[in-house]
Amino acid sequence: MEGLRRLLGLLLVLYRLCSALGKNLEPVTWNSQNPRFISGKGLVLYPEIGDRLDIICPKGDSSQPYEYYKLYMVRRDQLEACSTVIDPNVLVTCNQPGKEYRFTIKFQEFSPNYMGLEFRRNQDYYITSTSNSTLQGLENREGGVCQTRSMKIIMKVGQDPNAVPPEQLTTTRPSKEADNTGKIATFGPWNGPVENPGKSDTNLSDKPTAGGGVDGFFNSKIAVFAAIGAGCVIFILIIIFLVVLLIKIRKRHRKHTQQRAAALSLSTLASPKCSGNAGSEPSDIIIPLRTTENNYCPHYEKVSGDYGHPVYIVQEMPPQSPANIYYKV
């Protein structure tokens, strides 16, 4: 018991040390008034494996109407088209004006939860919303604030902001409403402004995109479900095999038991009895014979005695014979 406690304590210490290696990125408030969403580009982040990011659904304010959003993890082509019609992956829904709550993303390569998010280094991942900030437009699957206000997050996992310039992911021309947000430099996890090192912009197709990451995410889940299904099938087959084997063994045991019962003698031998007279034969034996199954039973039996040679008896009993017949030989 003491050893188990020490092991649990060691595991807890290791977990805290591993958790301390990552850092908490600056939370992102999902609101149209957030100046971090740059017009035509969105918000670019450079998280590392082990980091955490909180997306905040703010509490409603009486001075302005509450904004309703449904956030999705999307592929690059979905982000460019501002469309979540095909294969939507919902992360969080901001639809409770009475309270503020957070959705935490932990950037980890392997998730202990089979429905958890998994990330790979040097790949891009995308978050956006196609809602239009109203309750009626919460379920919109096209356009929305992704198109009008560039409310999207580009997460470049394990990448250096000074080595790779952020791509200009312009989907469509933003509306005039979005122009009043102003253009502010995007800050990475090192709290430094993202600068263009002077390299020419390259095509998005030449770089790792979130499509592979999201596809890998779904493929890993499919593999887990397939493995679970295969294990269940194998387990069921083993159970069926054991049940069939048990039934066969029980049938065989019953068959042997019936054969042994049928092989029992139909008569009972009495003890040999010696006569008190001196002139009587020493091999006098009284044998009671009784039929058990049928009224007519031809029977051949060998009887051994302690006072002479073996005696063989052949009997044929008609149906009207009494139950017990005694022969003196």
From Swiss-Prot:
Example of a GO biological process term: ephrin receptor signaling pathway
Name assigned to this protein: Ephrin-B1
Positions annotated as glycosylated: 132, 203
Cytoplasmic side: 248-329
InterPro entries the UniProt entry points to: Cupredoxin, Ephrin, Ephrin-B_Ecto, Ephrin_CS, Ephrin_RBD
UniProt keyword annotation of Membrane present: yes
Organism (species): Xenopus laevis
Function: Cell surface transmembrane ligand for Eph receptors, a family of receptor tyrosine kinases which are crucial for migration, repulsion and adhesion during neuronal, vascular and epithelial development. Binds promiscuously Eph receptors residing on adjacent cells, leading to contact-dependent bidirectional signaling into neighboring cells. The signaling pathway downstream of the receptor is referred to as forward signaling while the signaling pathway downstream of the ephrin ligand is referred to as reverse signaling. May have a role in the developing mesenchymal and nervous tissue.
